[in-house]
Amino acid sequence: MTKLLSLRSTRASWIDGLREEQAAAALQVLGIAGFALLTALGAQFSARVYLWEVPITLQTLAVYGSGLFLGARNGLLAQLLYLSLGLFVPVYAGDGTGVAYFAGAASAGYLLAYPFAAAVVGFLSKRWKTLAGSTVAMLAGSALLFTVGVSWLHYAADHASWWTSIDRGWLRFVVIDLAKIIAVAVVYSGVRGLFPAEDA
């Protein structure tokens, strides 16, 4: 039980070689481009619930994953690349594109928080590589993501109260986001276990 709840892992993995402090330049570029593409693909799986101002997407799976697998800097760069692509190509949820999207989308704050959420996850998971550690790292990234997203939503949607913004921008997504975090943590922990460094 103690080992299960431990944040730090003493076991190295081949997967750790993908992070910026260890990866070759070509592998770093591939990782950044790959997670930018995964984030774009996640936006295509978008569901809008009636009267909900923020769509449900799979993007945060890639946001959290980019921090875990690539580290803070490259996770941030992957999400910046995704946002940059969206200025010219319709890769945002709902086929949104361009600077005008940010001016009119109530959910744009979440997008702007992606790079920073990935960086937080990457920074914390540099040492916290266990199932519990990666989960805590993603919870911290999620807290930042929703803080920025809800704040943007409050002013963009002109809500009468902060409680309305918190309800519509966070509380409705808590269970969904926790499920995503657990899924990514299980995959990350499982992959690290499958590829120990001594077998690489």
Residue ranges, per PLM feature:
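Hydrophobic alpha-helical transmembrane segments
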Residues: 29-33, 61-65, 76-80, 107-112, ...
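Mid-bilayer segments of alpha-helical transmembrane spans in multi-pass integral membrane proteins
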Residues: 88, 106-115, 119, 123, ...
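Structural signal for the C-terminal ends of transmembrane alpha-helices
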Residues: 69-73, 120-128, 190-195
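Hydrophobic transmembrane alpha-helices
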Residues: 2-76
